[in-house]
């Protein structure tokens, strides 16, 4: 009898599978017939490739908000951003009056090797003029980038030279760093800001930790604000810095993939100091994995505002045309069992995209009291602290969004690009003397002898803003706006030194950063926050 029952069950399963395959086959036949009909009988010529891509996007739109189709070009751009490098000439530039102005060259990169200098203007690429052509960023990048080993001729205008200077530049791999800033925020307090979780992030983080350790770091602030995520494995490897071996960092569960645990493997030295993690409403995915893991295991204090709430795992599926479907295959869960994914309605991308705007309207970004979690979403950390799933990581210390930080005239000057235009001109005119007077970022920031933004500079920016028709009647208030002066200095320092110079100056105007500093400097309060309530 038992054998008959087994045969019945197996037969039912096989029939179910066969029916499912038949359904897919019939759907494919219907789609192919429609496509062939359009191609052969439609009144005008149709682009079959474009129609196919549109159909794929429409199918995925009916699923979750994060299953997406990427064109071959978008796949290349994604790989460059997360792969840790791209192939090109190695310059950092800005467009000024439709002309490419070199801000600086990558140290040891192709352009530096042939003698291209900061302040040079690239007028021609090969036999094509790029100056004055109103090319967008994508077109400029397309012309400058190319396979490693390929050679491009660049026609450069240099101050003091009457004719174009020509350089043969052999393209090479150019690193794209995921660490935006790394420095000692105070004696014994290190600070690392991550913009994304790329393949190279664990290696970059290890180097940054080593340098900070040499400078006497005992405690660390990890800034994940506005970090939209990246590779799950990179987040797991970063957890290795803070946790002993074999600790659960995250687990995933899906219909076809089952359950999979991700554990620490003691890849890096175990950091034992106090840890504070900064997050905000734009911190998502891999950022939430790291923050959620450290919170669940009571290894760090989370400071800021509730994170984005992306708890879905996508797997890349390559398409024959070089495109890719990023298909959601599972949910991820923090060690306490929290699913961080915020609610969504299948097919309603609009409401999902407006979630952050609705948080602002409902007052969540200004007050933690406006956030309500159901008891069914309650979980517990290792020490027994209550945490909630179902919609992002809620910080241990909530810091409201300060909407008064940037005044109306300050926003107007930024929106019109007036500040950036002025900095480009000022940098070009004073670059040499600035480097001589302030050879290091430390010299630039020195309280007594460091760089000071003058009234003349503020006046120059206001004049530029008026030329740009900046919509504000209060531009003169910028003379007494200290945050505005800090941003002017930060933009200039970013052009003079490494990229992290901007964060190093502007962090002191950030309520989230200052709250993190207050916690990490107060050992008693830090420990109390991690205790069971």
PLM features: residue spans?
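Cleft-lining beta-strand/loop regions that shape enzyme active-site pockets
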Residues: 18-27, 31-48, 71, 101-104, ...
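Extended, small/polar residue-biased N-terminal targeting/export presequences
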Residues: 25, 42-103, 149-181, 507-517, ...
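Structural motif
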Residues: 119-121
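Polar, glycine-rich mid-to-C-terminal structural blocks
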Residues: 286, 298, 305, 309-377
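Conserved functional hotspot residues or short segments at active or partner-binding sites
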Residues: 339-340, 344-533
């Amino acid at each position: 009898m038992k054998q008959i029952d087994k045969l019945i069950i197996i037969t039912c399963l096989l029939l179910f599978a066969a029916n499912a395959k038949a359904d897919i086959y019939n759907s494919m036949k219907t789609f192919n017939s429609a496509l062939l009909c359009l191609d052969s009988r439609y009144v005008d010529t149709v682009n079959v490739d474009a129609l196919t891509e549109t159909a794929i996007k429409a199918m995925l739109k009916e699923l979750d908000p994060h299953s997406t189709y990427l064109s071959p070009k978008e796949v290349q751009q994604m790989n460059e951003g997360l792969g840790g490098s791209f192939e090109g000439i190695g310059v950092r530039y800005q467009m000024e009056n439709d002309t490419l102005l070199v801000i600086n060259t990558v140290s040891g990169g192709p352009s530096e090797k042939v003698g291209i200098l900061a302040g040079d203007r690239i007028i021609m690429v090969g036999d094509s003029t790029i100056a004055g052509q109103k090319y967008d960023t994508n077109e400029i990048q397309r012309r400058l980038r190319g396979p490693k080993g390929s050679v491009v001729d660049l026609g450069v205008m240099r101050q003091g030279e009457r004719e174009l200077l020509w350089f043969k530049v052999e393209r090479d791999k150019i690193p794209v760093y995921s660490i935006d800033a790394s420095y000692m925020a105070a004696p014994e307090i290190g600070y690392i800001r991550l913009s994304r979780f790329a393949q190279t992030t664990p290696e970059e983080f290890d180097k940054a930790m080593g340098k900070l350790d040499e400078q006497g770091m005992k405690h660390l602030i990890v800034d994940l604000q506005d970090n939209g995520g990246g590779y799950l494995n990179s987040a797991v490897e970063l957890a290795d810095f803070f946790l002993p071996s074999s600790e659960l960092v995250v687990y995933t569960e899906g219909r076809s993939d089952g359950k999979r645990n991700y554990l620490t493997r003691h890849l890096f030295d175990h950091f034992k100091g106090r840890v504070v993690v900064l997050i905000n409403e734009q911190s998502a995915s891999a950022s939430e994995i790291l923050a959620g893991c450290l919170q669940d295991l009571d290894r760090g204090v989370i400071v800021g505002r509730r994170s984005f709430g992306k708890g879905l795992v996508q797997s890349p599926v390559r398409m024959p045309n070089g495109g890719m479907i990023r298909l959601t295959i599972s949910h991820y869960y923090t060690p306490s069992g929290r699913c961080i994914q915020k609610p969504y309605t299948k097919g309603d991308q609009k409401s999902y995209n407006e979630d952050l705007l609705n948080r602002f309207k409902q007052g969540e970004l200004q007050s933690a009291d406006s956030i309500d979690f159901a008891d069914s979403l309650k979980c517990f950390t290792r020490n027994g602290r209550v945490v909630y799933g179902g919609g992002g990581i809620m910080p241990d210390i909530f810091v409201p969004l300060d909407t008064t930080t940037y005044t109306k005239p300050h926003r107007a000057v930024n929106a019109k690009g007036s500040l950036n235009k002025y900095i480009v001109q000022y940098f070009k005119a004073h670059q040499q003397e600035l480097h001589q007077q302030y050879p290091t970022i430390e010299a630039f920031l020195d309280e007594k002898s460091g760089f000071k933004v003058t009234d003349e500079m503020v006046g120059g920016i206001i004049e530029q803003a008026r030329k740009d028709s900046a919509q504000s009647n209060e531009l003169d208030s910028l003379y007494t706006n200290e945050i505005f002066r800090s941003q002017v200095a930060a933009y200039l320092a970013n052009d003079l030194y490494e990229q992290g110079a901007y964060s190093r100056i502007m962090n002191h105007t950030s309520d989230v950063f200052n709250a993190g500093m207050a916690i990490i400097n107060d050992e008693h309060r830090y420990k109390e926050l991690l205790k069971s309530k």
